[in-house]
């Protein structure tokens, strides 16, 4: 049976299985969802067995459990290790959703729900391609699966798990569907990712909240101080001012800049899609270079003082911010983390206390386009989408990808099917049914090409 027919005859079942996963709110960041995490892992274990795995198990870690499964074809055949994650981001703000985030709906040819794309929908693509190959007797190499439950919080337990289970996870290449394409009719393969460093900043002033009339103008306001500190991290040219930050940043090669310049990109439509009137970033680089090949710094959240209804004239005792920096390959997140800690604490005035706490991070990654598995993925996209995919770097981070290379000694192929319009991490996350189908076709072709 051809793959298109198989998808058509089984799509209702595929979606029912996906929806059973989505209805389990596996939010790794919230301790209140610990039972949901275990339930989602167990559901994946069942689905992997039903798809054709020889064995599947839920394995403990220092945090949330992982799911491992494998299909053994031959000890002499190569092995593909499929990585995915079953945890999702919190759904807030709930009032911005057009439908319930954990009650999936199909509208306008798209699945709407938290995890529809990131990463339950994309994970299901991998599993259903595997299922088809097993049932049709087309699989010629070994396949292993490792699904983790902490990707959305920086994979804090996975590094130790990899080191403890190197033999179990031994493979020739890793396949990941957790990235995006340039467009529905513009398939692309991700050749690189940025790294990440993330901190929480706490600024403390007086020992209690003060009356802004009695003390305002005489006592430093921690929120004002925090805003001033953060405003100095980036200069007028969009460069990060932290000393030695750029020491390990390599200039984008001219050949790669030429490739990026050839990517179809409508800056006006880009601005319209995200609702901004102008773009801003590092001087001397294009928008696509800025958000993929160059480092960046962002304030992800800032709070303090009174934020309830009405007014309260208060000079707050504390102010907080969560900030992140996207890194490029060769920048080490631990080194960058310490540079930021040193810089912000040294910049702090003596009338407040500043505490900077690194939260999580990881290194960037680059995949060579001459790797046999990359070329198999390229042919997979061409078969399913009717055109050769563009090779692009992406601005997001999957910190564990660099750990795979360092610990397991193998490359990762980033064969993702998401779109920017899928609104991952945001209200109204969605995933195209058409791309879901084409994704299964592409992964099937990947495995068949990799056999060769």
Enumerate the predicted regions with their spans.
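Glycine/charged-rich beta-loop-alpha catalytic/anionic-binding loops adjacent to active sites
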Residues: 102-115, 207-209, 383-387, 424
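Active-site nucleophile and cofactor-binding loops and adjacent substrate-binding regions
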Residues: 59-61, 115-119, 390-396
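An extended, acidic, His-containing surface patch that forms the Zn2+-binding/catalytic region
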Residues: 50, 183-184, 241-318, 329-342, ...
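Hydrophobic core residues within well-ordered beta-strands of beta-rich domains
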Residues: 197, 319-321
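A generic structural motif
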Residues: 117, 207-209, 325-333, 362
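Fold-level recognition of mixed alpha/beta catalytic cores in primary-metabolism enzymes, strongest
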Residues: 116-280, 288-295, 404-406, 428-434
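N-terminal helical capping/dimerization or prosegment-like subdomains
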Residues: 1-94, 318, 335
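Active-site metal-coordination/substrate-binding segment of hydrolases
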Residues: 77-147, 438
